[in-house]
Amino acid sequence: MKKIFIYILCLILVCFLIPILFTKKQEIKEVVSTEKEAPLENYNYGQYKTIKLLHISTGKIQELDLDTYLLGVVCSEMPASFEEEALKAQAVVARTYTIYKIINKGKHEKADICDDSKCCQAWISKEERLNKWSQKDRENNWAKIENAVNSTKGKIITYEGNPINAFFHSNSGGATETATAVWGGNNYPYLQVVQTSGEDSYTQYSSELIVSREEFISKIKEYHSNFIIDFNLENQIEILEYTEGGRIKNIKIGNLNLSGVEIRNIFELKSAKFEIDVKEKIKFTVIGYGHGVGMSQTGADSMAKQGKNHEEIIKHYYTGVQITDV
């Protein structure tokens, strides 16, 4: 009788627990599947007129008027000698990038954004910027920066109603890249490969790096201690695959298969679009400057010189977007 009672009790417990287990799994699945970027409705341009800027060098947080902050970004990220429509495009891109960070809560717990270009956007104060320009250029240069920000006030780039993650870089080397090809992860539909003409006339277009064989081996071993290469054998360095934008996706070096992005990081190359020439020394010939995702700054300047306005420049580099007033 006692055994029958225990059996019935166990059966009741099993019947009770099974629905709970399945319900928990379903709840977790739904949370993951409904994760989305925050919509534009979460940001009120009139209400949030200030931004909290983290200064990486000091660790201090400064609160600034948003458009005052953007003046420091535009004059730091793009040469004032560039065409006015390129500067306007940079202002809209910077404003969009900033608002995207505010809405989606960036990496910094107590600040909206930082002044490190490798993490967020570069920034410099007006006083510092003016001191770095020659006295004869200061007034005209600052007027161009102010015009770029003020004439585009409140304008941002949106895709399907939401601010985009507006990546930009210095020089695409003739073609931009998808975000997935560079960082993996999310595929942003507005960050596609597009062509740009006229970038080869800029100093950022090409560069070289020459290292000894010993330094080449040493650099890679810093990241991969098991690295082996025999330069006396053929095909010790072989490009296996290119990205759609023409950068190296995968490359075989000795006993390793590495990504072009990793080689770029190891040797601090300006781009993942490169060739390697092996002789007594190793020569990297590099095309472009930066990750290649989103707007090319020199490409924007080239397009402006060809008569394109800032909205045309933006819509060229960001596929299927709209310019929206907030």
What are these regions (language model features)?
Residues 64-83, 193-204:
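Acidic/histidine-rich, surface-exposed loop or edge segments in extracytoplasmic proteins
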Residues 100, 104-282:
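Extended substrate/cofactor- or partner-recognition/assembly subdomains adjacent to catalytic sites
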Residues 23-63:
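N-terminal, intrinsically disordered, polar/charged segments of Gram-positive cell-envelope systems
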Residues 259-326:
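C-terminal soluble interaction/assembly domains
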Residues 61-64, 81-92, 210-214, 290-294, ...:
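Soluble non-cytosolic domains of exported or imported proteins
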Residues 13-23:
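Hydrophobic alpha-helical membrane-insertion segments, chiefly the h-region
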Residues 75-79, 92-104, 154, 221, ...:
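Sec-exported extracytoplasmic/periplasmic mature domains
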Residues 1-13:
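N-terminal Sec-pathway targeting helices
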